[in-house]
Swiss-Prot record:
Function noted in UniProt: Responsible for the release of ribosomes from messenger RNA at the termination of protein biosynthesis. May increase the efficiency of translation by recycling ribosomes from one round of translation to another.
Protein name: Ribosome-recycling factor
Database matches in Pfam families: RRF (PF01765)
NCBIfam families per UniProt: frr
UniProt family annotation: Belongs to the RRF family.
Location within or outside the cell: Cytoplasm
Taxonomic lineage of the native organism: Bacteria, Pseudomonadati, Pseudomonadota, Alphaproteobacteria, Rhodobacterales
Gene: frr
A Gene Ontology cellular-component term: cytosol
GO molecular function: ribosomal large subunit binding
Coarse class of the protein's main subcellular location: cytoplasm
GO terms, biological process: cytoplasmic translational termination
Keywords per UniProt: Cytoplasm, Protein biosynthesis
Amino acid sequence: MAEDIEIDLDDLERRMKGAMDSLRAEFASLRTGRASASMVEPVQVEAYGQMTPINQVGTVNVPEPRMVTINVWDKGMVGKVEKAIRESGLGINPQTNGTIIMLPIPELNEERRRELTKVAAQYAEHARVAIRNVRRDGMDQIKKGKANGMPEDDQKFWETAVQELTDKSIGNVDQALEAKQAEIMQV
């Protein structure tokens, strides 16, 4: 029975990648000085009696580095989309031209850039904590295996494998954070 004990590294790796994917999504929603279609993804619009993501009521484009446009499909929804953007907390003042809503992205000042780098660091720390929690789950599996008769050599092997996976994932988080902070601070 002791030989049958295995730790599911694939599951641990999948969960760590999930934390990384979540971090990338959070980073994408951070407003840098550059326009991005993902900036408006979290914005919900009341459409046809229910809350709907903006990308389901119109086409989101980035025609210029500092401009996001939303081509609303239903003319009657333009006002609601504009209102949702104003109330979203993005700090962007929409301009309407027929069914097209233009979102000019203002230049960020130095103070705001520093605040955003701190927010990015918080997001990265949340991802690190999630990865460490996955590591802890893996180590708990190893402890259960030890209690069920796992040989000490196997235990050391799995502990090393889980730790290497954790180190690699946290390294990826750190790289993503450095890249995002550089992007935010870029004038």
